[in-house]
């Protein structure tokens, strides 16, 4: 599923991401834009053999199990396939686990490079939330 910007903002808010660990909703919508273009089916192979999955491009080396990444940790305790569902509940649950890990949203390279330190409120502007 490819979410509309405001539709995604509303879903993320409903699932408790607004100000989760101090990150406003705009940060999450911005990250999703640059990670997946709001597409839950997005996948991306990395040079280390791991794959990133879903709307927030969550990585199989650390966070989910795809059955083929060597030495995978699966810290979210989920198969990576659930991160590709239209329903983003599991992706958000895992994202909360990731952002609580000490490095915050810096875990997402796209957030670090494109969202951090910018006016992320523009990502939710005009949305009825």
From Swiss-Prot:
Question: Where in the cell is the protein located?
Answer: Secreted
Name the chemical reaction catalysed here: Hydrolysis of (1->4)-beta-linkages between N-acetylmuramic acid and N-acetyl-D-glucosamine residues in a peptidoglycan and between N-acetyl-D-glucosamine residues in chitodextrins
Occurrences of domain C-type lysozyme (ranges) = 1-129
**Catalytic-site annotation from UniProt:** 35, 52
Database matches in SUPFAM superfamilies: Lysozyme-like
What cellular component GO annotations does this protein have? extracellular region
Q: SMART domains from the entry?
A: LYZ1
Class of this enzyme: hydrolase
Swapping residue 37 to G leads to an effect described as:
In 30% of the molecules
Q: Name one Pfam family in it.
A: Lys
Q: Which cysteines are disulphide-bonded? A: 6-127, 30-115, 64-80, 76-94
MF annotations from Gene Ontology: lysozyme activity
Listed EC numbers: 3.2.1.17
GO annotations under biological process? defense response to Gram-negative bacterium; defense response to Gram-positive bacterium; killing of cells of another organism
Q: Which UniProt keywords apply?
A: Antimicrobial, Bacteriolytic enzyme, Disulfide bond, Glycosidase, Hydrolase, Secreted
Hey, which family's this protein in? Belongs to the glycosyl hydrolase 22 family.
In its miscellaneous comment, the UniProt entry states:
Lysozyme C is capable of both hydrolysis and transglycosylation; it also shows a slight esterase activity. It acts rapidly on both peptide-substituted and unsubstituted peptidoglycan, and slowly on chitin oligosaccharides.
Q: What does this protein do?
A: Lysozymes have primarily a bacteriolytic function; those in tissues and body fluids are associated with the monocyte-macrophage system and enhance the activity of immunoagents.
Q: What is this protein called?
A: Lysozyme C-3
Please report the organism this UniProt entry assigns to the protein: Anas platyrhynchos
């Amino acid at each position: 599923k490819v979410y509309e910007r405001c539709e995604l903002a509303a879903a993320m808010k409903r699932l408790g991401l607004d100000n989760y660990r101090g990150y406003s909703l705009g940060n999450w919508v911005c990250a999703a834009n640059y990670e997946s273009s709001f597409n839950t089916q997005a996948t991306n192979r990395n040079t280390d053999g791991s794959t990133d999955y879903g709307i927030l491009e969550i990585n199989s080396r650390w966070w989910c199990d795809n059955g083929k990444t060597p030495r995978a940790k699966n810290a979210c305790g989920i198969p990576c396939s659930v991160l590709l569902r239209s329903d983003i509940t599991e992706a958000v649950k895992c994202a909360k686990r990731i952002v609580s890990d000490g490095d915050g949203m810096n875990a997402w390279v796209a957030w670090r490079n494109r969202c951090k330190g910018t006016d992320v409120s523009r990502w939710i502007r005009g949305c009825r939330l």
